Amino acid sequence: MSTASKSPAPSRRVTKLLIRDLAQAVSPAGTHAPIRGREAMRSVDVVEDAFILCEGGRISAIGRMRALDPLDGDVEELDGSGCAAIPGLVDCHTHAVFAGSRAEEFELRSGGATYEELHAAGGGILSTVRATRAAGAEGLADALALHRSWMLASGTTTFEAKSGYGLDRDTELAMLRVVREAGGSPTWLGAHAVPPEFADADAYVDFALAEVLPEAAKIAEAADVFLERGAFDAAQARRYLEACRGAGLRLRLHADQFTEAGGVPLAIELDAVSVDHLEATGPDGVRALAQSDVAAVLLPVAALFLDRPMPPGRALMDEGAIVALATDFNPGSAFCESLPLVVALSCTQMHMSPAEALAACTVNAAHVLGRADRVGRLAPGYEADIVLLDASDWRYLAYHLGANHVAQVIRAGTPTA
């Protein structure tokens, strides 16, 4: 692939871009979202010897090179020889705004300490809260810019990021603003942990709803809660989520990461957009999700990082649930920004096919974020967010474990540096 001489500077917006001579242009089949069911999830559209034409930041045409008509006007060209093009990847669950490091805790866990033990001792999430509060808005913006560059380099063009490492009014709102200003989808994770200045979870929920929610609802697109032993119970989660729904926020839950604590039925009852993690979800929860419109967002890196069982991805797929994939990128339990690694783990550890995994981190992840009408597919009218892989077969995204085959990322029709 020859890109060095034809890629414009990242600050220059391209009006019309032709990506030509692609080995493949690949996208989940169909036009609807979300995608569910084995047959639909395994259907991909593959155009060989392909071109993609982008105009005004959107895809205007895709086809075989032999069908390409002469183009009028000033057109930037990008040589895609030997490359497969896929939709820009969508990471619908991250904690990408944080300060500090938890490398020391990683070493302690490697020696046998558990995530829950570290959290109970004042480490874990609370150690990141201390560092994040001290960073200030400018420090948080710088941290997100760095983390965002890592994500972009691995093919993520659309991302969500949560608050939840401030747990006070000013830091929580600063985190949400930083995400919005970076072009991400901000989620208020006000109920992530109980900060040390509060005696109990109920008192903290009172504070969060009274003092933070009114302003958070003006910035965030969704609200999230960590429903788990040692964090917030089902009654506290319900109170928090019902108030957030009343403020106009879409609802999401962290649930069943370590124990089944009522998160799945609560998500279904409250018509949440997603319930995330699900490492501990049993057959009843799988069936209930399959009969609902709540998406199951699976985070295999977190399971690997914490040496936990993988989520029941294959069972959820076979039952017909809406399944999305994400990194859970965070400093403590999933220090990984790579959706290609998530795809590989989903195939090798959760027995998903490459096509299912691709749909789960494009169309279905975009559905979770309310963006499936404009990102997640290579199709005319969609935003021109495109990833070129330096492989002629798109399945190398999953097949070459640990490698980064992302050769070029196009965002809104403009190649990035």
Residue ranges and their predicted role:
Residues 18, 75-79, 186, 409:
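Conserved beta-strand scaffold positions in the cores of enzyme catalytic domains, especially
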